[in-house]
Amino acid sequence: MVAGVVDPTKLVFVDECGTHTSLAPVYGYSPKGERLRLSVARNRGKNTTLLASITLEGMGPSLAVEGSTTAEVFEAYLEHVLLPELGEGRVIIMDSLPAHKPGRVRELIEGRGCELLYLSGYSPDYNPIEEAFSKIKDILRRACARTREALLEALGEALSAISLRDAQGFFEHAGYHSMGQLL
């Protein structure tokens, strides 16, 4: 199945993104002749992983967990967070991370009347959620969240910042042309 054959309104891209409490802006401004000063946490703290989905309508259900993604965490995300929100006939697309491969993943997805597709290796250009994660990380850098609670709050705000127009643009850029025109 390729982008030109399937209705892009049925596509759901799923991926994960790691973040931590020492993210800081990569550039800034200061008065002419003065050096910009910014303190950055030396201790990254534990990694927080965001499991999320994106459709042409925008960001879908997400889950933030401490640590990395395991098969058990991913299965729980599918079973309790993502799949209850999806209707039948959706095509769920993800990369081939080992945590995405257990047989139960396919069983859960197909049991809900959806289809599972894996992207070929080294093909993040075909996954519109990668661009959403780029925007999310930019927002997180500006937020300078230094505690887990502040990071989770900033993640919620960053997810909300992905607009319908953003999502449609991410899909277009990845080669999944929508049936209609961008608004």
Where are the regions that the model predicts?
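Short functional hotspots at interaction and active-site rims
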Residues: M1-L183
